[in-house]
Amino acid sequence: MEINVLKNYEELSSTVADIVETQIKEHPLSKLGLPTGDTPLGMYDELVKRELDWSLVITFNLDVYLMNIDHPESYQSYMRKNLFDKTNIYPDHSHFPFRPTSAFEDKIDGSMGIDLCMLGIGTNGHIAFNEPGSSFESRTRVVDLDEQTIKDNSRFFDSVDDVPKQAITMGLGTIMESEKIVLMANGVNKLNILNVAMNGEVTEDIPASILQNHDNVEVYYCD
């Protein structure tokens, strides 16, 4: 699988924002899978600047921490701050994983699936919060976070002890049913795992490696 190497973070953000913009303009009723974290921040900033019409778009976030949704580091707060409060998307059109998790799957199915799913990748190869060892057939569920993920995400909290230990994540099987997937990665610390995931063995030990089996995946990287 080809990895598109871009010259800097600004180009990465602009390029993936172009993909989302095209999707929304050509298909106003689009269903999008949306990520959180550091990497997509530039993409969201670009999308806000472009003043797109989000009124018919439906979004499904990939994952959420099991924590108070009003906490400043909750992914609900993240999305409101970086995208939802700055666009005309209807609140009823933005969905986060919830319990019972089967009901979240039903919402995706009821919307006829995800058209475009945007992903990041963790240093251990996770996508969404599908940690190493996750079944390729997995659906939305509650998961325990890997020690590496907790350590990596501690930079967002006062201490590693404050990082939630559980999350609800869209499953690998759910993600793979998306019509198109775009994976973005930023930083030299992601290059090795990206190469392993995209060009190595397809194994549940590297959850992102399942993307090799999808027929419409684009990968973008900058250091």
Predicted regions, residues:
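ATP/nucleoside-binding phosphotransfer catalytic cores, i.e., glycine-rich phosphate-binding loops
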Residues: 171-173, 177-223
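Glycine-rich beta-strand-to-loop/alpha-helix junction loops that act as flexible
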Residues: 34-39, 119-123, 186
